[in-house]
Amino acid sequence: MAFGDKTLKRSDKGKDVIELQLRLSGFRGTLWDGDFGPGTELQVFAFQRDYMEMKKPNGIVTAKTFAALGKFAAEFPVDFASIRCRCGKCSGFGQDRFNGQYKVGMPKVEAFHRREYPGVHKAILHSYRTAKFYCQRAGFPPAQITSGYRCWVDNQKHKRESTNHMGKALDVDFPLLAGELKRDDVVRCDKGRGLLVEKSSFQTGWGASNRKSLEPSDIAPTWIHMDVRSYELKYLADEYFVTSSEELDA
């Protein structure tokens, strides 16, 4: 049964629940485990309240809510051209190399996992479009992706060692308005991070497992870095990585 073909509610289980949890990653957010529990219900409440502007959100995903999810995706599209790796050598999303290989001498945790994942994770993409929504509502200029996928070839060109941008992360910024200075960008990005912590349940830093993360302002003062590197490997399975809008919203 295709996503959207049946009503979803608390206690439901299955792949359609996983897809729902991913699409609502930026509305509070929960684990994409296929179990429609209280966390998923709160996601639906948040979407119905904040985007659909329902006076009495019910946490039940009927045809009306499915239609709103489609409208939301169309209103806040993801520009995959801005995400593709710029190395000129890979497909735009790495070469799926180094699975299970970690930086020498470092702990075997995702921060040091050298794998080039086969796309960008759905949770971070859906969280990005939700960030666009909340930031627009707060009066920000339109959010733009400034850094997406960066494979090892691109890393070597720029003398980088980070693995976050191999499918698990996006960097986002906002264009300066007329008369603004870079310090205004610092203030705006701080406010944006605050919105994402409040509305999308991001954590600042990587202290807790299975949480979406933001780089703190001392690392990313004039942009917002968001990633999913703190998740267990089962939540980073290949099926959660996509390379196009068609795959993201299928």
Say what each PLM segment does.
Residues 135-137, 143-165:
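Active-site-adjacent substructure of cysteine-protease-like catalytic cores
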Residues 4, 68-84:
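Intrinsically disordered, low-complexity Ser/Thr-rich linker and spacer segments
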Residues 16, 29-35, 54, 126-129, ...:
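Catalytic phosphate/metal-binding cores of nucleic-acid and nucleotide-processing enzymes, i.e., regions
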Residues 32-33, 56-58, 139-149, 201-217:
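Surface-exposed patches in mature extracellular/periplasmic domains of secreted proteins
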Residues 79-140:
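Active-site acidic/histidine clusters and adjacent loop/turn architecture
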Residues 3-12, 29-34, 54-57, 109-123, ...:
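Second-shell loop/turn segments in exported
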Residues 7-72:
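Short acidic, glycine/serine/threonine-rich helix-capping segments at coil-helix boundaries
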Residues 161-170, 174-250:
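Catalytic cores and adjacent binding grooves of peptidoglycan-active enzymes
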